Structure formats: structure tokens, C-alpha cells
């Protein structure tokens, strides 16, 4: 038996060896094909599911999470990157600085808005009588006086103010002898002042007809009478209306036409009412 075994052809062992090698190669090829098939299957799965979360040993580095990985070409619009909560880009630097700067800017803008839009006073100053033109009706013993007055209106605001109307009346001996009203006067710009003239026609007659003799008396050069000038100015801004009133006693010459120089104090002599 041993002899017969010793004379067995060697090529059979070689064939067996070749067969073993071939089978091993086939197995390797099968594994490679299986892996390729599995990769194709995974690629197909990825294409079917645009949002995929990779976990475990098969996971790859996220290209947008501080990594350097790559994704297959053509799948840029199919894959969704998962950014971890601990990613530093989710915690921007200088957040406190930006918040403080935003708060400071808001406070600054609010302060400026309050400063410029806060309503300030509108000053009305009665300057005096600018002119007085006199005419007479001898039959009715009536005196007609057209009195032109001057006002200075000052706007202390940082925005324009509209002067809606001026209402004026003149009293003599506690009797109203003339009224006037002017509408839609003018606009006064920010921190500006305008001088406005207005005329009040007055009539002295009836129970005060005795004044006709005084005003036409030739022996007197100056026929001054004391009149109380009342004026109310209505202004408007931002839909809000405000009224400013003034009362002044003023000398007016009823014996002739007179033009007053407002700079001269003698024509601005004012009698204050008794307290």
C-alpha cells in the first residue's frame, strides 16, 4: 500500500492546489462582487432617501461639521448634513458684545427721538400797535378805527408748526368794539420765528358817541385812548392743537392817522389792569 501511495502522480496534487487557488480567487471575487453590490445597494438606498443618518462603523465624517470628508458627485442635492449641537459655529463669538451694542443703539435712537419730538412751548409776544387809521361819520357821531397789530411767534420745537388761526378783539371801557379772525396763516419752521401783522376794524358809536367830541377836538394834539387788545393764536403740530392767549392795554390816537415805530418805547406804553 505504501508503495502504491508513493507513486501517485504529483499533478493531481498540483491540480488540487490550482483548484484551491481558483476556489479562493472565486471566493474573493464573490466577496468583492458582493461588496460592490452592497455599495450599489447603499447608493441606491441613499438616492431613494434624501435624508440619511449614518451611525456606527459605516458612518463617514460630515463634510460640513469641521471635517474633510467627501460625498459622491451628483448627490449634493440629495444628502443632508447633520451638524452636532456642540459645533462651535452654532455659538457665534462676541454675542454679548453684539447684544450690548444693539441695546445701546436702540437706547440712543429712542433718546434722540424723545429729544427731537418732545413738544416744546410756542411763544407768542404781542409787540404793539403798528398803525391806526381813523375815519368819522359826523351824522352818526361814529368813529371808525382800523388798528393793525404785530405779533412775534417763536417755534422752539425741532419740527414745523402750523399757525391755524388768529382771533383778536378790541375792548374800550369793557365794551367790545371790534373783532377779527384770520385763518390758515402760515407755517413756522423748526427753531424759527415769524412776525405777523393783523388788522382789527373797530367802531366807537351809540352809547360811546361822546368819544366823537373828544377825538375831533382841535385844541388837543394827541387824542390817546386806552384800548385792551386781546389775541388768541391757535397752532397745530402732529394733529395736536394748542391755543396761546395774550391781553395788553395799549394807547391809540383816535384823532388822526398814525403809524407807530415799534422800536420807540413811548408808543408801547402799556397800562396794567389793577389787581
Curated annotation (Swiss-Prot):
Residues 119-275 are lumenal. Pfam families: TMEM106, TMEM106_N. Disulfide bonds join 215-254. Coiled coil: none annotated. It comes from the Eukaryota. GO terms for molecular function: ATPase binding. The chain crosses the membrane at residues 98-118. The modification Phosphoserine is found at residue 34. One of its GO terms (cellular component) is lysosomal membrane. Glycans are attached at residues 146, 152, 165, 184, 257. Keywords: Cell membrane, Disulfide bond, Endosome, Glycoprotein, Lipoprotein, Lysosome, Membrane, Myristate, Phosphoprotein, Signal-anchor, Transmembrane, Transmembrane helix, Transport. Expressed in the brain, in neurons (at protein level). Expressed in the spinal cord (at protein level). Its main location: membrane. A lipid is attached at residue 2 (N-myristoyl glycine). Residues 1-24 are annotated as: Disordered. The keyword Aminoacyl-tRNA synthetase does not apply. Residues 2-97 are cytoplasmic. Disruption phenotype: Knockout mice are born at the expected Mendelian ratio and young animals appear phenotypically normal. At 10 weeks of age, knockout mice develop proximal axonal swellings caused by drastically enlarged LAMP1-positive vacuoles (lysosomes/endosomes), increased retrograde axonal transport of lysosomes, and accumulation of lipofuscin and autophagosomes. Giant vacuoles specifically accumulate at the distal end and within the axon initial segment, but not in peripheral nerves or at axon terminals, resulting in an impaired facial-nerve-dependent motor performance. It is a single-pass type II membrane protein. It is found in: Late endosome membrane; Lysosome membrane; Cell membrane. InterPro entries: TMEM106, TMEM106_C, TMEM106_N. GO terms for biological process: dendrite morphogenesis; lysosomal lumen acidification; lysosomal protein catabolic process; lysosomal transport; lysosome localization; lysosome organization; neuron cellular homeostasis; positive regulation of dendrite development. Belongs to the TMEM106 family. Can form homomers. Interacts (via N-terminus) with MAP6 (via C-terminus). Interacts (via C-terminus) with the vacuolar-type ATPase subunit ATP6AP1. Interacts (via N-terminus) with AP2M1 and CLTC. Interacts with TMEM106C. In neurons, involved in the transport of late endosomes/lysosomes. May be involved in dendrite morphogenesis and maintenance by regulating lysosomal trafficking. May act as a molecular brake for retrograde transport of late endosomes/lysosomes, possibly via its interaction with MAP6. In motoneurons, may mediate the axonal transport of lysosomes and axonal sorting at the initial segment. This is Transmembrane protein 106B. The lineage of its organism: Eukaryota, Metazoa, Chordata, Craniata, Vertebrata.
Amino acid at each position: 500500500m505504501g508503495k502504491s501511495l508513493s507513486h501517485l502522480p504529483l499533478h493531481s496534487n498540483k491540480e488540487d492546489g490550482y483548484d484551491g487557488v481558483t476556489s479562493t480567487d472565486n471566493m474573493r471575487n464573490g466577496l468583492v462582487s458582493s461588496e460592490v453590490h452592497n455599495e450599489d445597494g447603499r447608493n441606491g438606498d441613499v438616492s431613494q432617501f434624501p435624508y440619511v443618518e449614518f451611525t456606527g462603523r459605516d458612518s463617514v465624517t460630515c463634510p460640513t461639521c469641521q471635517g474633510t470628508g467627501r460625498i459622491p458627485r451628483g448627490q449634493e442635492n440629495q444628502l443632508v448634513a447633520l451638524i452636532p449641537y456642540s459645533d462651535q459655529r452654532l455659538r457665534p463669538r462676541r454675542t454679548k458684545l453684539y447684544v450690548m451694542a444693539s441695546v445701546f443703539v436702540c437706547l440712543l435712537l429712542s433718546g434722540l427721538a424723545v429729544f427731537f419730538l418732545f413738544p416744546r412751548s410756542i411763544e407768542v409776544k404781542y409787540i404793539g400797535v403798528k398803525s391806526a387809521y381813523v375815519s368819522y361819520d359826523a351824522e352818526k357821531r361814529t368813529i371808525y378805527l382800523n388798528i393793525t397789530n404785530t405779533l412775534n411767534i417763536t417755534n422752539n420745537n425741532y419740527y414745523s408748526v402750523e399757525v391755524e388761526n388768529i382771533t383778536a378783539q378790541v375792548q374800550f371801557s369793557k365794551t367790545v368794539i371790534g373783532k377779527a379772525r384770520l385763518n390758515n396763516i402760515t407755517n413756522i419752521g423748526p427753531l424759527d420765528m415769524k412776525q405777523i401783522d393783523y388788522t382789527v376794524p373797530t367802531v366807537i358809536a351809540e352809547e360811546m358817541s361822546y368819544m366823537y367830541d373828544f377825538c375831533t377836538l382841535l385844541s388837543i394834539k394827541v387824542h390817546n385812548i386806552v384800548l385792551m387788545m386781546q389775541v388768541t393764536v391757535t397752532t397745530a403740530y402732529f394733529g395736536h392743537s394748542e391755543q396761546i392767549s395774550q391781553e395788553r392795554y395799549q394807547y391809540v390816537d383816535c384823532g388822526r392817522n398814525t403809524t407807530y415805530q415799534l422800536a420807540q418805547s413811548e408808543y408801547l406804553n402799556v397800562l396794567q389792569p389793577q389787581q
